[in-house]
């Protein structure tokens, strides 16, 4: 009897304690799950915490435009980046009808692809190609079509699915581009290039038409900061980050022979440093909690190789800085599986080995050469391709220097050609002049190619120095007289402007 009374008293006492403690403001006590596991892992009896729904989440449509501006298996990484971005956005709830994809689509089924029909963007990554819509592929991946799509102008689109950003004043737009670039230009697999001022004018026109509420733009390319430096307005409700500043390269990563390395059967880089940084950040955080600013900071640290800038670049930002306070889900969507992920936590400070964007093509060709059978015709052909590519690079470099000597004299040429304007200044005063000088050069000396895009600042400086069209023609003819451009003649490659 006494034992029964004691047990009853003890039980009532425990219940009293539990009832009392549940009302005390003791941090972490009973109010928390006391989950000993990592964030994002729940016990079977637990339910995910409800996510607050913002008013903004009920208004407007999220749009995305994804652009891979290259072609060829050596540029595998650009299409891998874009396919990965598509999968991320779809998991975030963006509808296929609101995501428009530009990619040449010559990678997945390429004879050099060791995994036919599959594209990966990480050494241990899953296929990111499956389900990606073929909106604008092959010859339809052009700057002109991109402009028409952004403006929602169906009548101006040539080929492709015909999808355009038919957005309304309360909609949000996310634009992501990955490819080669140069001062003032972004590459396209079908020439001409995208020129900065043309692109900015399209953005201004979209804003003037009330075509969106806010826009976020991410750009992966060499010298990508030059696309916006000095010409990006702050009053058009657009926030931009770029993989590099106006003067430096961006970087390929997950490359053969480097760490982290792709699976051994791959001969090409799987991704780009800035691109994998933002996507892997988005996949590991709750985008209802993480802000645009937090992602910018994380990506900036990782792309700089953790502030060493040893084979890293300076991630830059332009446009309306107030957008940085917005939560990322407003542009990239929200994956319910990430509900208990942290809002942001830095990756381990593990520098990644990378290759300069402009050298990635040679790195790829060298991998093919090393893996070819000794003495085979294939090995000889690849070696000749490498020699031809290096020879054309050398020709471009020496021709530009000689043209400078002819225009300004040997003593002044280098200083003028390599001149860099003050931060905040546009690359060139007359963008029409820039295009004209590029066409004159390519007519005489051959196509710039992905490598030669680096000389765009030289052309800009020639324009800024007041050189006439006639003087440029005379200098180019003298510098490249007798040169046979062969496969790199603009009649084969097209003009870059």
Curated annotation (Swiss-Prot):
Its EC number is 3.4.22.-. Keywords: Disulfide bond, Glycoprotein, Hydrolase, Protease, Signal, Thiol protease. The record marks 269 as: Required for post-translational maturation and enzyme activity. Disulfide bonds join 255-269, 433-463, 445-480. One of its GO terms (biological process) is proteolysis involved in protein catabolic process. The active site is at 180, 222 (nucleophile). Gene3D superfamilies: 1.10.132.130, 3.40.50.1460. Asparagine-specific endopeptidase involved in the processing of vacuolar seed protein precursors into the mature forms. Belongs to the peptidase C13 family. This is Vacuolar-processing enzyme. It comes from Ricinus communis (Castor bean). The lineage of its organism: Eukaryota, Viridiplantae, Streptophyta, Embryophyta, Tracheophyta.
């Amino acid at each position: 009897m006494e034992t029964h009374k004691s047990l009853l008293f003890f039980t009532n006492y425990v219940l009293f304690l539990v009832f009392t403690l549940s009302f005390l403001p003791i941090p972490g006590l009973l109010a928390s799950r006391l989950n000993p596991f990592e964030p994002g892992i729940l016990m079977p009896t637990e339910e995910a915490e409800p996510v607050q729904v913002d008013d903004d989440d009920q208004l407007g449509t999220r749009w995305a435009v994804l652009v891979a501006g290259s072609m060829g298996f050596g540029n595998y990484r650009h299409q891998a980046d874009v396919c990965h971005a598509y999968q991320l956005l779809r998991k975030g709830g963006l509808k296929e009808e609101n995501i428009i994809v530009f990619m040449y689509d010559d990678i997945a089924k390429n004879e050099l692809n060791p995994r036919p029909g599959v594209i990966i963007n990480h050494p241990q990554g899953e296929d990111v190609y499956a389900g990606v819509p073929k909106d604008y592929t092959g010859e339809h991946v052009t700057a002109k079509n991109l402009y028409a799509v952004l403006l929602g102008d169906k009548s101006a689109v040539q080929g492709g699915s015909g999808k355009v950003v038919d957005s309304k004043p309360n909609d949000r737009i996310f634009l992501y581009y990955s490819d080669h670039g140069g001062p003032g230009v972004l590459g396209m697999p079908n020439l001409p290039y995208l020129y900065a001022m043309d692109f900015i004018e399209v953005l201004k026109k979209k804003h003037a038409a009330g075509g969106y509420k806010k826009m976020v733009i991410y750009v992966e390319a060499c010298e990508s900061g030059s696309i916006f430096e000095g010409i990006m307005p702050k009053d058009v409700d657009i926030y931009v980050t770029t993989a590099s500043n106006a003067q430096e390269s961006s970087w390929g990563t997950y490359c053969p022979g480097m760490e982290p390395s792709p699976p051994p059967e791959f001969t090409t880089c799987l991704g780009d440093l800035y691109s994998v940084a933002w996507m892997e950040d988005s996949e590991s955080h709750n985008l209802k909690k993480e802000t645009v600013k937090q992602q910018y900071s994380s990506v900036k640290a990782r792309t700089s190789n953790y502030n060493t800038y040893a084979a890293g670049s300076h991630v830059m930002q332009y446009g309306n800085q107030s957008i940085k306070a917005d939560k990322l889900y407003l542009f990239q969507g929200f994956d319910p599986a990430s509900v208990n992920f942290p809002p942001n936590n830095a990756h381990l400070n593990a520098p990644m080995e990378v290759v300069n964007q402009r050298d990635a093509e040679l790195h790829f060709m060298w991998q093919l050469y090393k893996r070819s059978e000794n003495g085979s015709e294939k090995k000889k052909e690849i070696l000749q391709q490498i020699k031809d590519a290096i020879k054309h690079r050398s020709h471009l470099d020496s021709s530009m220097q000689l043209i400078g000597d002819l225009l300004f004299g040997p003593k002044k040429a280098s200083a003028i050609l390599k001149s860099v304007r003050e931060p905040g200044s546009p690359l060139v005063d007359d963008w029409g002049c820039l295009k004209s000088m590029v066409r004159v050069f390519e007519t005489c000396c051959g196509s710039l190619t992905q490598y030669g895009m680096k000389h765009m600042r030289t052309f800009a400086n020639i324009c800024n120095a007041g050189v006439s069209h006639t003087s440029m023609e005379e200098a180019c003819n003298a510098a490249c007289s007798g040169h046979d451009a062969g496969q790199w003649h603009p009649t084969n490659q097209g003009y870059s402007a």
